[in-house]
Amino acid sequence: MQVYMLLPLAVFASLTYQGACEETAAAQTSSDASTSSASSEHAENELSRAKRGSYRMMRLGRGLHMLRLGKRGGPVEPESEENLETLLNLLQGYYSDVPEYPSEFDDTDLAYPYEEYDAPAHPRYRRSTPPTDGVVAPDVLQKGSSEFEDFGDSQLDESDEGYYGYDPENYLYGDFEDYLEPEEGGLGEEKRSLSMLRLGKRGLSMLRLGKREGEEGDEMDKKQDESLNDDFENDDIKRTLSMLRLGKRPMSMLRLGKRPMSMLRLGKRPMSMLRLGKRPMSMLRLGKRPMSMLRLGKRPMSMLRLGKRPMSMLRLGKRPMSMLRLGKRPMSMLRLGKRPMSMLRLGKRDDDEKEKKSLNMSRLGKRSTQ
């Protein structure tokens, strides 16, 4: 009986234990889900806050930009009617007092007839003039007016060097053209000054690089030209030889390998002898001969050196005309092992006849004995 009573108790305990376990698991899952949802909500809130902050900054930037453009400067408040009426009255009075198209601009017309315009009692001509409250001493007014009157009456003198005429009809006409583009001869030298130079255009007597001006320079040029070369003309239009530029110099100053007879130096010849490889007899150097002796391998008797012989004694395969047969040499050229012309047959000597005779005699003796 006891066993039967314990069995349902054990089953009931196991069931309650399983239910408790399932409840704890469900509670854990619900807690996890709640934490995850809370974290996601927190992240979404932070993102929305960042977006809202960015939107606010964008709106602030747009507002500042609109303020720069003159918009949204604040609430637009209409002007009061009193202010508008005063402004209109001032404008109408000013328009009626001042003409629309004034004929002349005069300092005397600057006085305002009405007291309602806020105008100074007198104009300040200089910054150094002390400011006043409307009370001006009479000497100050007289001084200022006299200065302006003196300036208006003053005129430039036409004889002055800085005066070129204010009349537009005389501009670039008449004598003024000679200042800009002087002709040959042109004006006097006192008027052709450096102040008239423009864009590389100068008078004929103007200073250029290396060119002198005045009578002293002309006299020096003439002296140099006469001493150097009498063929050149002394004209004002042409440059003198002593003034030449661009690598050109007079005859006494020639460079680039050309010099006159009186300026010859080492290796330099006069103009009449400046042909390549040609030198006169007095300028011969080693290995150089005059034109009459400039044949290859030919030298005169007076210029023989070691190993060189005159025409009649040339060797190297060349003989005079009377001896131009191969293997023939004259008596005066015999050397060791060489014989005269009458003995120069290949393999033949002076004792050939004796040998022949001896051979013949020996042959005859043999035949006779036989």
UniProtKB/Swiss-Prot annotation:
Expression tissues: Expressed in all ganglia of the CNS, but only in a subset of neurons including L10 in the abdominal ganglion and B16 in the buccal ganglion.
Subcellular location: Secreted
Keyword Repeat included in the entry's annotation: yes
Biased composition (Low complexity): 28-40
Biased composition (Basic and acidic residues): 210-226, 347-358
Leucine amide sites (modified residues): 60, 69, 199, 209, 246, 256, 266, 276, 286, 296, 306, 316, 326, 336, 346, 364
Signal peptide feature range: 1-18
Gene Ontology terms: biological process: neuropeptide signaling pathway
Positions of the UniProt region annotated as Disordered: 28-52, 210-230, 344-370
Propeptide: 19-50, 73-190, 213-237, 350-355, 368-370
Cellular compartments per GO CC: extracellular region
Keywords: Amidation, Cleavage on pair of basic residues, Neuropeptide, Repeat, Secreted, Signal
Task of the protein: Exogenous application of myomodulins potentiates ARC muscle contraction.
PANTHER family referenced in this protein's UniProt entry, alphabetically: FMRFAMIDE-RELATED PEPTIDES
Name of the molecule in the record: Myomodulin neuropeptides 1
Species of the source: Aplysia californica (California sea hare)
Phylogenetic placement of the source organism: Eukaryota, Metazoa, Spiralia, Lophotrochozoa, Mollusca
